[in-house]
Amino acid sequence: MRYLTAGESHGEALIAIIEGLPSNLFIDAEFINKELERRQKGYGRGGRMAIEKDEIHIISGVRDGKTTGAPLAMEIKNRDYKNWKDKKVPPVTRPRPGHADLPGSIKYNQRDIRNILERASARETAARVAVGSVAKLLLKELNISLKSRVLEIGGAKREEKWKRLIEKAKKEGDTLGGIIEIVIEGVPVGLGSHAQWDRKLDALLAYHVMSVQGIKGVEFGLGFEAARLPGSLVHDDIYYKENEGFYRKTNNAGGIEGGMSNGNPIVIRAAMKPIPTLLRPLDSVDIATKEETKAIYERSDVTAVEAAACVLEAVCAWVIADECLKKFGGDSVEELKRNYDTYLAYVRSF
């Protein structure tokens, strides 16, 4: 499968196109809308969330509620567009440190930074949540599920501290990042491959996780902690039980060994940096005058860690769904499930 997204933060709409979905997959619009709503929630979100009510509109690829095998096109309207479409917007010339503003303007020879920031905005992730929601619907057919949780915000591990830290950052014109954990359950042995570098499952997941705006680090299982421990305390012992097959008592590998899923839950943690749009802007240089100044302030969040958890679920769901289709094949959901059940029977008998 593959997908593309299009659209800008304050444009008319966001668009997503998915190619390669099997036919006869029930597209639950209510479920997709609930996932979009999840993305909009979280303490510390900005004023934009009071304007938008993200809802999916299916354009093509679905008939009588099920996919046909044709490309699936979806649209999410930007309600804030009506506030911008007839507005004379002055050019943005003061880039924000940590954002796409300056490198994007230089790369694409743009003297108005808005031509970069509109597409670079994390608003784009609404389209990816829609795509990931479709992937989740496909994985549900195979009894594979994802969940996420926020582990830290602003360095604090206890949830009762987060609200206080967010309020403090808001008063000081600052922003906060955090750490998110994603767990994927029900993944069978053998997704991904050791045979080529670009087929390794952890590499594919890391690539997609790192593509999410604001994510600066990723680890699996023990992650960086494994570097501080001897091998005898890191690697998961292998056991066997008749009628159940091979199993582990620990999951330090995070469900992936040698670039392949090993049957354990896949455990991923991602680090999100603080949002680079600050109410108390950092030092910058005006690209038009070359004079020292302060960066532009655009309406933004104090933190979006909870929202990012939903986005990370979506991109991970896409990877697992795509790998399932690569391995098991099937032009229809029925064919995919037959192939999948045959493989699971083989694994149990190995």
UniProtKB/Swiss-Prot annotation:
Subunit structure: Homotetramer.
BP terms from Gene Ontology: amino acid biosynthetic process; aromatic amino acid family biosynthetic process; chorismate biosynthetic process
Cofactor: record remark: Reduced FMN (FMNH(2)).
InterPro entries named in the record: Chorismate_synth (IPR000453), Chorismate_synth_AroC_sf (IPR035904), Chorismate_synthase_CS (IPR020541)
Coiled-coil parts of chain: none
Annotated positions binding FMN: 119-121, 213-214, 258, 273-277, 299
Region (Disordered): 85-104
A family per Pfam: Chorismate_synt
GO molecular-function term, one example from the UniProt record: chorismate synthase activity
Pathway listed: Metabolic intermediate biosynthesis; chorismate biosynthesis; chorismate from D-erythrose 4-phosphate and phosphoenolpyruvate: step 7/7
Residues noted as binding NADP(+) in the record, renumbered to the chain: 39, 45
Protein known as: Chorismate synthase
Reactions catalysed: 5-O-(1-carboxyvinyl)-3-phosphoshikimate = chorismate + phosphate
Protein function: This reaction introduces a second double bond into the aromatic ring system.
Family, similarity comment: Belongs to the chorismate synthase family.
EC number: 4.2.3.5
Native species: Caldanaerobacter subterraneus subsp. tengcongensis (strain DSM 15242 / JCM 11007 / NBRC 100824 / MB4) (Thermoanaerobacter tengcongensis)
Annotated GO CC locations: cytosol
Keywords (A to Z) from UniProt: Amino-acid biosynthesis, Aromatic amino acid biosynthesis, FAD, Flavoprotein, FMN, Lyase, NADP
Upper classification of the organism: Bacteria, Bacillati, Bacillota, Clostridia, Thermoanaerobacterales
Classification via SUPFAM superfamilies: Chorismate synthase, AroC
Cofactor(s) needed for function: FMNH2
